Regions:
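Nucleotide-sugar donor-binding/catalytic module of glycosyltransferases
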Residues: 1-199
Length: 199
């Protein structure tokens, strides 16, 4: 899911990153806070390109006023239908065009194949609650600058967050059925993602 507001200068990078993914089962939710710039125009062009793509992704856009980023992220949680949800907001990008395929492979390792199960609660329980990775810092052109200061631990527990947000939400793939039970606390202006990841 991509949350944005007046993000015309940033949204193309994110759209292109998702559009390039080689994983065929992508649901891209774009939750826009009623942008007044060219953000929605870029999203509509994306939807048009996607409609004629060889392997189209499902692209849905909701544009309406919200009460901040975490309210918008909660809207995405309610709309999501996939097995996992990732918040890749305007300006964020995935590491490579294989990122989502690699995540699906990691999530389904217990199955011995690379196909996610049908959306059946009994099958979903076999999938890991979270799949996560490292985060790189890049410049405006997308060139690598450095690895993020806090590195993701080998095993993720709530204790790993004692020293800060060890896994960025941009690298935190949460199982949708579980994530939906723990909405973002909109009372927090800046740290609701930290609180959400711990829960």
């Amino acid at each position: 899911a991509t949350v944005c507001y007046n993000a015309a200068s940033l949204i193309e990078r994110t759209i292109n990153s998702v559009e390039e993914q080689d994983y065929p089962h992508v649901e891209h939710l774009i939750i826009d806070g009623n942008s007044q710039d060219a953000t929605l125009e870029a999203v509509h062009h994306y939807q048009e390109r996607n409609s004629v793509a060889r392997v189209p992704h499902e692209v849905n856009c909701l544009s309406e006023p919200d009460h901040g980023i975490y309210d918008a992220m909660n809207k995405a949680l309610r709309m999501a239908t996939g097995h996992y949800i990732l918040f890749l907001n305007a300006g964020d990008t995935l590491h490579s065009r294989q990122t989502l395929s690699l995540v699906a492979c990691a999530a389904t390792a217990a199955y011995g194949d690379h196909a996610l199960p049908e959306a059946d609660d009994s099958d979903l329980g076999m999938l890991p609650a979270v799949v996560y990775g490292q985060t790189d810092i890049v410049d405006e052109q997308g060139h690598f600058l450095r690895h993020r200061r806090l590195t993701a631990p080998e095993v993720l527990t709530w204790r790993a967050f004692r020293h800060g947000m060890t896994v960025c939400h941009q690298a935190f793939f949460a199982r949708t059925d579980l994530a939906r039970r723990m909405v973002y606390n909109t009372a927090y202006r800046f740290s609701a993602d930290y609180d959400w990841c711990i829960r």
